[in-house]
Amino acid sequence: MTTQKTVLITGFEPFGKETINPSWEAAKQLQGRELCGARVEARQLPCVFDVSLACLYAAIDDVQPDLVIAVGQAGGRPNITVERVAININDASIPDNQGNQPINTPIVATGPAAYFATLPINAIVKGLRDAGVPASISQTAGTFVCNHVMYGLLHHLACIYPEIRGGVLHIPYLPEQAARYSGTPSMALETVITALEIAIDEALKNSEDIANNGDTAH
């Protein structure tokens, strides 16, 4: 009997001056769904250094997923961006939700300088574009909690769960957020949900990534 695959998708609580976070607004819509034969489990992460990783690790232990996709908000970006790499540095320009603001500190003191996503990032971008969803590969996840979570996730998987693949997708503001900032791009929630469905589908279908699709980095 074949065991059904499971996907863990996470989104963040609101941070900064925002009252919503599109990453969680979208991710929670996938809770309990079946996509490409896999069951989706959604979990919310706090926008807090270290605590976010403790919550993520607990979720991985609980769900025992085949795939982990962490989703974050990238206000100002116009499209879905699939992160290529996470670096071993915390360098926060604003405090997290508990007032922590680490500057130039390592995420894992003995860890490598960086980890590459183990998701098929080119396949995901191509799948999104083929469906009419604007998407690109990003070469930086920043140095705030999203990068912290991506690095911590990939370090945890490499050390404890090497069979699990994972990575991070950044999504734009929702229209109701962007309306407060003149000229800021946004993406409808329904489009973001579709994008996450496609990302999961492509990741499950492609155990190996496709050739570079000519994406322009952002």
Swiss-Prot record:
The record's GO CC annotations read: cytosol
What interactions and quaternary structure are annotated? Answer: Homotetramer.
Q: Pfam family of this protein, just one?
A: Peptidase_C15
Its recorded name reads: Pyrrolidone-carboxylate peptidase 2
What gene codes for this chain?
Answer: pcp2
What does the record give as the function of this protein? Removes 5-oxoproline from various penultimate amino acid residues except L-proline.
Q: Where in the cell?
A: Cytoplasm
Its signal peptide is none
What is the species listed in this Swiss-Prot or TrEMBL entry?
Photorhabdus laumondii subsp. laumondii (strain DSM 15139 / CIP 105565 / TT01) (Photorhabdus luminescens subsp. laumondii)
Question: What does UniProt list as this organism's lineage?
Answer: Bacteria, Pseudomonadati, Pseudomonadota, Gammaproteobacteria, Enterobacterales
Question: What are the UniProt keywords, alphabetically?
Answer: Cytoplasm, Hydrolase, Protease, Thiol protease
For the protein in the UniProt heading, the enzyme class is hydrolase
InterPro entries, A to Z: Peptidase_C15 (IPR000816), Peptidase_C15-like (IPR016125), Peptidase_C15-like_sf (IPR036440), PGP-I_bact-type (IPR029762), PGPEP1_Cys_AS (IPR033694), PGPEP1_Glu_AS (IPR033693)
**Entry's family note:** Belongs to the peptidase C15 family.
Q: Which PROSITE patterns match?
A: PYRASE_CYS (PS01334), PYRASE_GLU (PS01333)
What is the reaction catalyzed? Release of an N-terminal pyroglutamyl group from a polypeptide, the second amino acid generally not being Pro
Q: Which NCBIfam families match?
A: PRK13197.1, pyro_pdase
Specify the domain of life of the species encoding this protein: Bacteria
Tell me which EC number(s) this protein carries: 3.4.19.3
Output the GO biological process annotations, alphabetical, semicolon-separated: proteolysis
Q: Which PANTHER family match?
A: PROTEASE FAMILY C15 PYROGLUTAMYL-PEPTIDASE I-RELATED, PYROGLUTAMYL-PEPTIDASE I
For this chain, one GO molecular function annotation is: pyroglutamyl-peptidase activity
Which SUPFAM superfamilies does this one have?
Pyrrolidone carboxyl peptidase (pyroglutamate aminopeptidase) (SSF53182)
- Which residues does UniProt mark as catalytic? 83, 146, 170
